[in-house]
Amino acid sequence: MSARLPFVLRRLARPQHPGSPRRLPSLCRASSGRGSGCGGGEGLLGQQRLRDTQAGSSRGPGSPAPPARDSIVREVIQNSKEVLSLLQEKTPTFKPVLAIIQAGDDNLMQEVNQNLAEEAGLNITHICLPAESGEDEIIDEILKINEDSRVHGLALQIAETSFSNKILNALKPEKDVDGLTDVNLGKLVRGDAHECFISPVARAVIELLEKSGVSLDGKKILVIGAHGSLEATLQCLFQRKGSMTMSSQWKTPQLQGKLQEADIVVLGSPKPEEIPLSWIQPGTTVFNCSHDFLSGKAACISSGVHGISPIAEDVSLLAAALRIQNMVSSGRRWLREQQHRRWRLHCLKLQPLSPVPSDIEISRAQTPKAVEILAKEIGLLADEIEIYGKSKAKVRLSLLERLKDQADGKYVLVAGITPTPLGEGKSTVTIGLVQALTAHLNVNSFACLRQPSQGPTFGVKGGAAGGGYAQVIPMEEFNLHLTGDIHAITAANNLLAAAIDARILHENTQTDKALYNRLVPSVNGVREFSKIQLARLKRLGINKTDPSALTEEEMRKFARLDIDPSTITWQRVVDTNDRFLRKITIGQANTEKGCSRQAQFDIAVASEIMAVLALTDSLSDMKERLGRMVVASDRNGQPVTADDLGVTGALTVLMKDAIKPNLMQTLEGTPVFVHAGPFANIAHGNSSVLADKIALKLVGEGGFVVTEAGFGADIGMEKFFNIKCRASGLVPSVVVLVATVRALKMHGGGPSVTAGVPLRKEYTEENLQLVADGCCNLEKQIQIAQLFGVPVVVALNVFKTDTRAEIDLVCELAKRAGAFNAVPCYHWSIGGKGSVDLAWAVREAASKESRFQFLYDVQLPIVEKIRTIAQSVYGAKDIELSPEAQSKIDRYTEQGFGNLPICMAKTHLSLSHQPDKKGVPKGFILPISDVRASIGAGFIYPLVGTMSTMPGLPTRPCFYDIDLDTETEQVKGLF
């Protein structure tokens, strides 16, 4: 053992010269604590607290000199450094962080910790609290560190009297690098030393004895004045070395006799003055592990005592080094947890009934797992979720940074053939597939679904959580408010709408000077532009920041947006089907001074803000997209944006929580993200990019993320590939194309299918000819998917009226049409077990190389992109532009928006623009009646015919069946 180490400790214990610099204050920052803080004394030390200080401070007075090569401390630190270097070869940015919570003035070991950490390659965060900090204050700090995923270890440097059980067990065991918690101690006693952290102080005692050549077998060990985890750890470690261990307190009557018999003495607390050193026999090895000695406040007990081994003085420094070693082990465990692994998921058991009950009865019969348990099972940390009730949680975007080096899973899109008005079960197939993958094949999988609008829920469609034994639970929470994302969109959208009309009013009723003075007021004698106003000045080419420096022309240019009311495209929204809001007149009150105009309401999910939410990939990206949204043109034909109105920051504030995906679960306890639900006709109709990206990281390599596209493949899938995949950069592995015998019969010439009207006998009896004729639509949709180079698996969603012959016929014809595979699915009636064949088919298809490609180059002219979609996807002969559509195309091209992708808005009930044309219409001319732009979302949307953005209520809406049991508060009637 290097002789320098005891010298270092004695040097640290020596009072600092008054004239020498005190370096610790420079490492601290202000604390709200009372009295003296770290280091005691007066001034800055008494009022400050240090956070996030890297272990890189230069050595100064009191710093330990580098130990000799043969030093055990050097060996420990060098070993830690080498292990960390190996970890960093795979994860170069990884650097473990040790947090030290200090209450009081025990500073003398701080520089030792700093320099050892620096040498090993760690960072240290030092948190200084006032000396008089109570139990609750210390625990508050512990809990913060527990949930901070950037910190990998936590040590306490507090008064010995403060080490209460409550404080010790507030520590997260996996961050307890001092081995203080009951969990770590219990694992040690049980023999699981490799799974726990062991007290560095106790380990230091054992290491020093063994390195000095002392055999512990048969030795008598006396531990005096120790208690708690240190006493238990010392006893456990010594006993495993074959030693006879005794514990005693200082006031024990037989203490002198025990001391004289002991070969090794370990002091756990300061020696009382009345106990003479002569009681300790010459040649006895004494270790002082008392709190005061380890913190450098007291000298070693062996000072001046002949025959007591000097190695006892080295406990403190070696303990600090072993803490660093524990830190590296903690970091290694943390990295291992970040790596892809199969989830240890507790799946929920199903007991399917026949006949199958209603969706809400099935949902209510299954008790979901607590969402925090689900989150932990799939690898989410406690600080990465925000819990809403018992079964919902938002997931923070910080997860993407933590898992940025993890490989993505496979990306699967569920699309469909041209549907009947009843829908063909894409959501049900999506949920059935992930239940099969995870609950039955033990494969990590995630479903990513759109959030349904309350309008259709209370109108004609009912719930959208899947159906039968393949649904999201609790389905009433899924279908109603969820976590309020749509309400946030409504608030943000209508704030922007109000800002537009208010700005027109104020510009119409004020002079240039008055308008400018109100936009840039003097506050407490100071006049300055806001951040967003400075951005507008820059866009206008006005390079001035002093409001008083603008010329009259510049003030006018800045203050007046000069919006042309006839060009306003931004409408108010509400999440209710209300046909009487399709055309309204606003501004009729006398207070609006004649600024009335015709306007309309849209359904909330038709708002461009919903499309922005679905396509954004970060908070900053969302803010930029919101600012770019074009709401109108000025009288010179230039676009007016949310940024011009100065409302971008406020919109972002309203949307800051909505951007976080919502975590729920399926009936079998597998994870689901429910996030964003843009209108599938005027927008792209897919769930959010962020939900997909987070899910792909969570499932890891070998896992699957399954998402769905709205309507048929000709609409939803085409938009998914050309719009969503461009925005996300993600490449799909497989398309699952959902078909039903019912829909195929309709395309084969069967009678019309109408919601709310019983099906004709053609749909409930076997009819192979209708099925065969209708497979032309299935073949066309397979061909559309193949345009993008993605393999197709056909999922035949089986109904109870389908016959074996019909099922076999569809699967055979699908394979002939080029599908990779085609399988019948029974998830609706028996859950994930009924989609196991589909899961195997998807896994096999995903193992093949995807040759994904976009349908068109966005740099093509707008007209050519529209024509490409019409001819290649819909099968049209050509397109026909109305004069208004041509005018809009010319305007958008002139404004610089011609390079955006296309989002076609047309009926979903036919490949053509005519809903009654089933099968595969050919030779038609696709009429483009209008062209609009969602610049913030990032696409141009041509309107094919007329397209309503506000649904209406039918004669008998779904709300007739919806009720609440006022005794149990259970929702009834949500299908």
From Swiss-Prot:
Lineage start: Eukaryota, Metazoa, Chordata, Craniata, Vertebrata
Top-level class of the enzyme under EC nomenclature: ligase
Binding annotation for ATP: T420, P421, L422, G423, E424, G425, K426, S427
Domains as described in the record: This monofunctional enzyme consists of two major domains: an N-terminal inactive methylene-THF dehydrogenase and cyclohydrolase domain and an active larger formyl-THF synthetase C-terminal domain.
Modified residues (N6-acetyllysine): K187
Protein name: Monofunctional C1-tetrahydrofolate synthase, mitochondrial
Ranges for region Formyltetrahydrofolate synthetase: 346-975
Protein's gene: MTHFD1L
A GO term, aspect molecular function: formate-tetrahydrofolate ligase activity
